[in-house]
């Protein structure tokens, strides 16, 4: 009996580990959780390999367990792809811990089944390895989880055990990194948005979990109001009742909402501008969104400031000068108050260094570079601002002048696989050495891979216990890849695939010892399993920066295209993922783009592949579209037709599709194709109902259409674009607001020009 479910699970685990290697999540709770998932999967994977090699028997119960874990691993991969620092930290950690629990439960179930099955196996070492896996999986426990802290905090809140409750809440605040009042406000808004999404999904379990998390955020806000004191002058703290229940800052302009609660105007306006229609404190639905000034509270605050001889000027606190207290709000700038609560002080001091280089409030590192005319397609080079996300390995590039250079939109795109991201998997260890109780170690040595390349020359040498292969064994594997026996070649490709999943050294070592060329020849194999092992091994090797150029130089493009056209679903997916990984390098983008067959094969997969295949194809095409000349090639391959179809929210590909369309809209052929394929209505719908990233890129496409064609501008207006653009100009991301405002301004200019023409 062919263990298909086991093979599927192994493939899913390999893809997940590869994705982890390509990500740079800097948010410690999620990074720890992902690391522990990797450890559990690495414990189980060798046993599954033995099942495939028929060293351990299998049965239907095992297949059922593998299918369950396969589903969980795919959920974990989806989470990793979709998570962003813009989303709720609380939800992210909670979801990640739920997935970790499922991985442990499913792994333990499979291990126990394997233990029973291995009793009948003649290989005693199999029994020992399975027993060790069961023992380590059973004993695994992640300390100080959010779920554990949350359960204690909420339970103690109900029991009114305030001292213990405070301790748990402070631990949660520290875990989530809610350093400032603005961090808390942002988290409150994102959690409420998650509640709206869970209501739309109509899942009772999701709604129950969401309500618990909202209750937790309420507890945190109340806790901070009671325990975190803000000093406006030495020894003078702001009373809690003068502070906004939403942001916990001093209410500079107190207003009353429909529920009767008072908030600071700036904070509650941010809440309402994000489309949230419930009271942040009472959870009542707001019957209207009018903000009524609370002159009583405002006068009380002014009186309190005057009594304490305090004047709050921008970025400073000094003696009150006897001026008009009613003008208080106009004189108050950003609240530069001293936080006197000890645990908050430790939080701020520990984070100031890492945050000091960031732009205030956006979570991006900013770097200005010069982009040449070859990228922009113009006679002059222009300065672009590169914003690099501090977590899921995404890059976000855009030009201030859309007419000068095409937009490089934000998708799940890794500009390069750094040594730090590769080392997130850690060095390869034998299962007997791994302890799932340890957090995943991450190397910060940026020269790690280059030093590895110098160390592993093609001469016989001994190795330490890290799991790196010997050169003699590598050479033997390379010779096996050239063998006349299909069975020997398949086994060698499978072993290289396995050895390159986790080890940086093995990737470098195998690449330098000549495995790439024979692996490429196996991509033409008529044996689908051989082809799949070979293309996945190449995908793993391509993670290494040192291998990327080498793989393309020895002629990888044509064989990878062959797999895209002839392989099974998994081989096609991994071939597209390989092209995505290789296209991180500019020189590779140009070479791949010059092969029209490669672009056409990726477009075919985008249109007719599996869901995973479509996502990998979209990612690869996005990378290729960064190079200007490739934009027209992608359009000519009929990609726009499929991308417009993928704007359907039910297909769960909107963000990737609209990001690629944003790049393609920079060329005339792309704009014509978008309109011809009926993209305008779906783009307007994305501006209205899409994610923040989707709205941003959809607005960028519409802007390109309108700036370059009055006819297209009329079509956009006919689709009712103005209301969602007005909303986006007030509540979107900074870049989305800019795009929306540019569009609205363009519409006004067009209208004024028509009116002038009519009068004349």
UniProtKB/Swiss-Prot annotation:
Biased composition (Polar residues): 424-434
GO biological process: protein ubiquitination
GO molecular function terms attached to this record: ubiquitin-protein transferase activity
Boundaries of every U-box domain copy: 237-311
Residue ranges, annotated region (Disordered): 424-448
Pathway, per record: Protein modification; protein ubiquitination
SMART domains: ARM, Ubox
A Pfam cross-reference name: Arm
Tagged with keyword Acyltransferase: no
EC number: 2.3.2.27
Record key words, sorted: Coiled coil, Repeat, Transferase, Ubl conjugation pathway
Function: Functions as an E3 ubiquitin ligase.
Protein name: U-box domain-containing protein 3
Name of the gene this protein is made from: PUB3
